[in-house]
């Protein structure tokens, strides 16, 4: 059974401001309460085939080994992780809009036998994880944009 979940939000900044915060994977847990840890394990950061460990604090505490599938900074990154019989392909895009804002999008495709346990409650919890992650990332990126504007 395949499951597709997605979330999006608009941010008052450019994709570069979002990427400036997002690319520092080792710092995610400092500003993102859904992440307990994130650290590179193999390869060069953000290169196809590179691996990192993603520790989630919620909706349930778990560590997911992740491999980068594609990365095109500052606009797109995708990775795949496997846990509890689930293959999860997770994508992020940061798309500039004509009004100067950025559409932040994330989507994830889950497959494998473990998806049988993805009831409505689990899906809502994952969507809440996306919303909380993007709320924190948006806050940080908009702060970076305001600071850049103040310096110019």
What are these regions (language model features)?
Residues 103, 109-152:
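A conserved amphipathic terminal alpha-helix motif
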Residues 1-42, 136, 152:
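Hydrophobic ligand-binding cavity/cleft-lining segments
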């Amino acid at each position: 059974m395949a499951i597709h979940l997605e979330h999006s939000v608009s941010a008052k900044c450019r994709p570069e401001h979002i990427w400036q915060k997002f690319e520092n994977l080792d710092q995610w847990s400092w500003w993102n309460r859904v992440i307990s840890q994130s650290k590179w394990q193999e390869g060069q950061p953000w290169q196809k085939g590179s691996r990192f460990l993603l520790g989630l604090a919620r909706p349930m505490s778990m560590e997911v080994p992740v491999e980068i599938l594609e990365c095109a900074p500052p606009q797109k990154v995708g990775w795949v992780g496997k846990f509890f019989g689930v293959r999860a392909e997770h994508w992020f895009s940061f798309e500039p809009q004509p009004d100067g804002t950025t559409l932040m999008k994330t989507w994830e495709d889950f497959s494998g036998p473990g998806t049988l346990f993805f009831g409505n409650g689990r899906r809502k919890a994952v969507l809440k994880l996306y919303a909380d992650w993007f709320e924190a990332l948006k806050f940080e990126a908009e702060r970076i944009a305001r600071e850049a504007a103040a310096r110019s």
